[in-house]
């Protein structure tokens, strides 16, 4: 990125409300038993907490948890000298509480909250006036402290340093790159089989889902809908989050079925069919094994929906369903040209930057709309999270692991959007017989872009819009390969690959006299023999596509209705259409 853009991004990040987790170490005032740690939320703009517990002095906790400390009347006669004040949240601002505590000699302020913890905010002038730390403690943790240690305790506030890199990033990297590579490969192979294989209507279960070609109008409508939905989620999160969860359950079960169906069809058992009937869907007489598969996929989705908040294991189901959903979408949605790929990626590139870096200037809270929606608003009453992410718990041990942020996230959009470009590259590879150089290069570029995202995440210590790094890496790499091979014209327009069902091999130029079928097959290159191999395995009674004038893969020189044979341009590596 340009230096100016990076500087602007950093300035916008600084404008957001700072919020960090810390640790409250509690020991009994009488000594004896071992201490215990509790999670706190603090704002370092009031005052920073030390990172090393050994450099922190234990101070007495002054319990005024029944007082809100909003006026001088709430300050006890015996002030807070060399003590940490504990007060209740409410009735006045954080600044008023901490100003009174600091004026009474307190070395820190703990605010107990029965609601969800939120960052203790202030403004720049107030931050400069205050020199003691301010932190929030949950009411549940306070009750546990009193139950274990009583009301006479010594406490210390500190913020231990976290590991710069967590091993869960490796798992997220493998899942993301693997999904993009597998989805792109599957999408290209699926299209080739559809073009090369004569469609048959006598076996409904073997029919593949039709791909959906994306047009520029569809891209614009999609982006507008994304913006509209994101704003709705920002203002009506508690109501719409359950709608999103329901949609995810339905879509992910469909994706899981689509991924497992090809494997299940190869099993040698449960091939019996449903008896004749007039029921919806069942009138097609599906096989028993496919019904069992559908039941299994729905069950997995329902189990996740019921136990989605079980942090110990529900994330495994969510990631499995999410990967299946992404693979299904990459196979179903098709960008027909590189022009469409560029339009989609650039528009979503701007969309991602706007909702992460620009919206903090437009919201009253100063928070990013994208970050608020992705992580769940701090004032949400449901505490639900959107499921449209891959999530992996933190694997490194840290005192901060007791706080409520154990997962690293990667949104589905950061997989699907570049993945559609990877899928297009694979289809173009097959068209020009380029040994999959576009597919491999774009997949590697995606992996490098994801690594850059992780590095930025570590350096900036803040959630990053991954498309900021993924879009330039994948688009520039694809363009570079096309220019190097002198195929930019064909790569940009798709060379008619999406406009008509063509075979992936190039036809010879000019009229060529008919040849014996066996001789022509023997003269084909090895790559073309492999491409045509599905035709040799057609079931008995199927029509030979080469002899059927209505077949989409009929020979390019087969005249129909007296039309004159016309030469077809060749698209070969090293040339442009």
UniProtKB/Swiss-Prot annotation:
PANTHER family cross-referenced by the UniProt entry: SIGNAL PEPTIDE PEPTIDASE, SIGNAL PEPTIDE PEPTIDASE-LIKE 2B
Q: What is this protein called?
A: Signal peptide peptidase-like 2B
Q: What function is annotated for this protein?
A: Intramembrane-cleaving aspartic protease (I-CLiP) that cleaves type II membrane signal peptides in the hydrophobic plane of the membrane. Functions in ITM2B and TNF processing. Catalyzes the intramembrane cleavage of the anchored fragment of shed TNF-alpha (TNF), which promotes the release of the intracellular domain (ICD) for signaling to the nucleus. May play a role in the regulation of innate and adaptive immunity.
Ranges of residues in domain PA:
49-149
- GO terms assigned for molecular function: aspartic endopeptidase activity, intramembrane cleaving; protein homodimerization activity
Q: Could you name the Gene Ontology cellular component terms for this entry?
A: cytoplasmic side of endoplasmic reticulum membrane; endosome membrane; Golgi membrane; Golgi-associated vesicle membrane; lumenal side of endoplasmic reticulum membrane; lysosomal membrane; membrane; plasma membrane
A Pfam family: PA
Annotated segments matching region Disordered = 502-577
Q: Which family does it belong to?
A: Belongs to the peptidase A22B family.
This entry's Enzyme Commission designation comes to 3.4.23.-
| Subcellular location as annotated | Cell membrane; Golgi apparatus membrane; Lysosome membrane; Endosome membrane
Give the residue spans that cross the bilayer. 169-189, 217-237, 240-260, 287-307, 313-333, 342-362, 406-426, 439-459, 464-484
Query: Looking at the keywords, is Transmembrane helix present?
Result: yes
Fill in the domain comment.
Answer: The PAL motif is required for normal active site conformation. The catalytic domains embedded in the membrane are in the opposite orientation to that of the presenilin protein family; therefore, it is predicted to cleave type II-oriented substrate peptides like the prototypic protease SPP.
